[in-house]
Amino acid sequence: MKPSSEEEGELVQGVGPWDECFEVAVQLALRAGQIIRKALTEEKRVSTKTSAADLVTETDHRVEDLIVSELRKRFPSHRFIAEEATASGAKCVLTHSPTWIIDPIDGTCNFVHRFPTVAVSIGFAVHQELEFGVIHHCTEERLYTGRRGQGAFCNGQRLQVSRETDLAKALVLTEIGPKRDPDTLKVFLSNMERLLHAKAHGVRVIGSSTLALCYLASGAADAYYQFGLHCWDLAAATVIIREAGGIVIDTSGGPLDLMSCRVVAAGTREMAVLIAQALQTINYGRDDEK
């Protein structure tokens, strides 16, 4: 369902120093969604980045250029971390300055194949603290938002995570990541097997980490884990999950490190710890060391 003008008005209201930034992010996410929906049905020029499974299209670049250029006009002193700029050699460093963390199309492989699970993700951090996140599920026109201390919403409806604590009653989401060498695939499949041996109801892969995390925030899944995601996949969704009452931690069980390329998220701390304890680590390095 497309957000109504009334709902959009509700979403941009708030009391805080970053209200204008949040409002602009919402409008840009909606504009980006229009571009992505139109391009979804068209022919695409596809390139690869780190592997044959790590894809990029002209639309990724077009959407990122739109978002970054508009934000630079409005907020010239702010910093940016954006997926395609980073792939082209820009440094991925989170400082204390106001910083936008952008994934123009999360689910590019889905986008290429016209599989309708595709999103644009815009996160915002100040003093290395995540302030808000905006994620637009382009094909279903669902707008997920979260602001620190102000709750999380989808098209104006408040989100609430699942309160499940029993892994044997859990639906768990994950993503494969771009590395497909035999050792990485062996550990990936082993981690799924461990959760299934623990009698989890199921393990799902949908091709978009940001939307999987939004489904967790909505209570449609109980946990999420991944090795190989990046800060632009995680920033906006982390705020949304936390504001929906959920937990986001490192796969070691410690506090989340946005640059570590790994995460466990769940509706409850008990569930997050159970997942973290079951996992074998896959090393993807760090975003701020690439």
Curated annotation (Swiss-Prot):
Listed under catalytic activity are:
a myo-inositol phosphate + H2O = myo-inositol + phosphate; 1D-myo-inositol 1-phosphate + H2O = myo-inositol + phosphate; 1D-myo-inositol 2-phosphate + H2O = myo-inositol + phosphate; 1D-myo-inositol 3-phosphate + H2O = myo-inositol + phosphate
Q: Give the protein's function.
A: Phosphatase that can use myo-inositol monophosphates, myo-inositol 1,4-diphosphate, scyllo-inositol-1,4-diphosphate, glucose-1-phosphate, beta-glycerophosphate and 2'-AMP as substrates in vitro. No physiological substrates has been described yet. Has been implicated as the pharmacological target for lithium Li(+) action in brain.
Protein's GO biological process: inositol biosynthetic process; inositol metabolic process; phosphatidylinositol phosphate biosynthetic process; response to lithium ion
- Keywords on this record? Cytoplasm, Hydrolase, Lithium, Magnesium, Metal-binding
Q: What is the lineage of its organism?
A: Eukaryota, Metazoa, Chordata, Craniata, Vertebrata
Q: Which family does it belong to?
A: Belongs to the inositol monophosphatase superfamily.
- Annotated localization: Cytoplasm
GO MF terms here are: glucose-1-phosphatase activity; glycerol-2-phosphatase activity; inositol monophosphate 1-phosphatase activity; inositol monophosphate 3-phosphatase activity; inositol monophosphate 4-phosphatase activity; metal ion binding; protein homodimerization activity
Enzyme Commission no = 3.1.3.25
Which gene does this sequence derive from? Answer: Impa2
Q: Which residues bind Mg(2+) 1?
A: E83, D103, I105
Cofactor(s) demanded: Mg(2+)
Q: Which Pfam families match?
A: Inositol_P
Pathway(s) of this molecule: Polyol metabolism; myo-inositol biosynthesis; myo-inositol from D-glucose 6-phosphate: step 2/2
Q: Is Zinc set as a keyword in this record? A: no
* Protein's name in the database: Inositol monophosphatase 2
Chain positions recorded as substrate binding sites: E83, I105, D106, G107, T108, G207, S208, S209, Q226, D233
Q: Does the keyword Phosphoprotein apply?
A: no
Entry-linked PANTHER family: INOSITOL MONOPHOSPHATASE, INOSITOL MONOPHOSPHATASE 2
The protein's matches in InterPro entries, at most eight in alphabetical order, are given as: IMPase (IPR033942), Inositol_monoP_metal-BS (IPR020583), Inositol_monoPase_Li-sen (IPR020552), Inositol_monophosphatase-like (IPR000760), Inositol_monophosphatase_CS (IPR020550)
On subunit structure and binding partners, the annotation says: Homodimer.
Natural source organism: Mus musculus
